[in-house]
């Protein structure tokens, strides 16, 4: 840590109080790299200060992951023991909240056997499928944040020394997370959330049938939205009314596309870090909601594996609007991390939708969600396609065209 300890303490408090908003006697589950133990201790201290029942750790280590994928057989990797399911089920039964701390190097697993990685991901996803709704339906609070590491910083700023790269990434993370020395991050987020909630309210009221996207990259895509869709921006609430901020940072307003209602071509505007590799220069062509053609300048086989993950991976689960004139975009930094990069540009997500994006969706069964037009998948992968010159038109139910974005920014 090169920034003052006070700055990291501010971020830790923000994550606990505003991010997951730990409640008295509620367990907090933290997923973090072993390298981040000092920051994790800060988070744990903040959690206990607000009355957390316990702090449960799920440690990760990239080097151990490489060894695991290199030396374990696929049979061993895909044999997910019942105790892992039971452990997560216990956390849910206790009403836990979840905090994930990102700091790993993008592309860290690029040299391991990707067939093993995919096999493990699919086996784990299948084992835990019925537990995913806990976070996807916001049954408990959850939040994702980022802190810098030298390994990550050198990918973002390869021409700088390790120390300079780390400090520059550190500054960028604090800035985009609205953590500063001379202000209260909790108040900063209260104001910011209010702005996003108001934008989402306006978009929901407009009740668009479709959105039409065009950009200088060649994107010409029409996305039909589900009936009774709901736009969400800023924080969210659990069924018990506990407010939390799922992403720190966030600049997006997002909703649910109709599974079979997407047509046209879309060109990604930023690379995508997926399964330990970085996919770049990629595009998709959709017909009746499904990706029917695609290409990539880098890691096309990895992109293919993403699309073939399961039956719903070639359909969209989310469409999100992010103005080009926003803190992350204005930083002109490519983070190679979806948490940050998705909040620099409009994005789409292949796979699983958020049920809350359709009216009463959190209370719907899987069949009811399907009937409403929702996609179904075990993964949710965001990719960025927003640009400086992106234009978006909203088509209302009566065919009226309403300009939504011009030259990358909101005009409503």
Explain the meaning of each model-derived region.
Residues 35-36, 104-106, 149, 218, ...:
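Short, glycine-/Ser/Thr-/acidic-enriched flexible segments
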Residues 1-263, 400, 410-412:
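Active-site bordering "gate/hinge" segments
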Residues 13, 204-206, 275-277, 312, ...:
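Short solvent-exposed loop/turn micro-motifs enriched in small/polar/acidic residues
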Residues 253-311:
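Long, well-ordered mid-to-C-terminal structural blocks that present hydrophobic/aromatic surfaces
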Residues 367-412:
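Extended hydrophobic packing segments that form well-structured cores
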Residues 292-362:
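Dual-mode signal for accessory low-complexity, basic/Gly-rich regions
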Residues 261-263, 279-281, 288-291, 314-318, ...:
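Active-site lining segments that contact anionic ligands and/or coordinate catalytic metals
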Residues 111, 155-157, 278, 306, ...:
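Short conserved micro-motifs at the rims of enzyme active sites and ligand-binding pockets
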């Amino acid at each position: 840590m090169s920034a003052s300890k006070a700055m990291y303490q501010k971020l830790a408090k923000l994550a606990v109080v505003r991010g997951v908003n730990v409640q008295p006697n509620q367990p907090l589950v933290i997923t973090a790299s072993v390298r981040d133990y000092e920051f994790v201790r800060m988070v744990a201290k903040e959690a206990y200060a607000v009355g957390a029942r316990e702090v449960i750790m799920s440690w990760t280590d990239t080097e151990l992951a490489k060894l695991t994928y290199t030396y374990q057989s696929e049979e061993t990797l895909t044999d997910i023991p019942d105790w892992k399911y039971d452990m997560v089920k216990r956390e849910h039964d206790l009403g836990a909240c979840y905090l994930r701390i990102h700091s790993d190097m993008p592309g860290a697993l690029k040299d391991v056997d990707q067939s093993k990685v995919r096999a493990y991901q699919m086996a784990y996803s299948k084992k835990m499928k019925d537990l995913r709704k806990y976070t996807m339906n916001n049954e408990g609070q959850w939040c994702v944040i980022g802190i810098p590491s030298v390994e990550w910083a050198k990918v973002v700023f390869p021409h700088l020394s390790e120390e300079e790269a780390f400090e520059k990434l550190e500054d960028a993370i604090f800035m985009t997370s609205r953590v500063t020395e001379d202000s209260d991050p909790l108040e900063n987020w209260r104001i910011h959330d209010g702005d996003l909630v108001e934008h989402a309210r306006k978009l929901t009221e407009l009740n668009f049938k479709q959105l039409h996207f065009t950009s200088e990259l060649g994107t010409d895509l029409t996305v039909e939205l589900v009936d009774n869709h709901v736009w969400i921006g800023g924080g969210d609430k659990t069924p018990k009314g506990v407010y939390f901020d799922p992403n720190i940072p966030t600049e997006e307003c997002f909703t649910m596309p109709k599974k079979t209602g997407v047509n046209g071509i879309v060109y990604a505007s930023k690379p995508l870090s997926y399964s330990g590799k970085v996919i770049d220069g990629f595009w998709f062509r959709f017909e009746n909601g499904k990706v029917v053609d695609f290409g990539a300048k880098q890691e096309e086989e990895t992109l293919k594996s993403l699309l073939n993950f399961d039956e719903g991976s070639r359909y969209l689960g989310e469409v999100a609007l992010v103005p080009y004139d926003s803190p992350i975009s204005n930083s002109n930094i490519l983070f190679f991390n979806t948490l940050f990069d998705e909040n620099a540009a409009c994005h789409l997500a292949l796979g699983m939708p958020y049920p809350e994006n359709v009216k009463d969706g959190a209370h719907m069964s899987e069949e009811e969600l399907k009937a409403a037009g929702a996609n179904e998948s075990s993964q949710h992968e965001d990719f960025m396609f927003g640009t400086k010159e992106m234009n978006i038109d909203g088509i209302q139910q009566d065919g009226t065209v309403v300009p939504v974005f011009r030259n990358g920014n909101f005009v409503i």
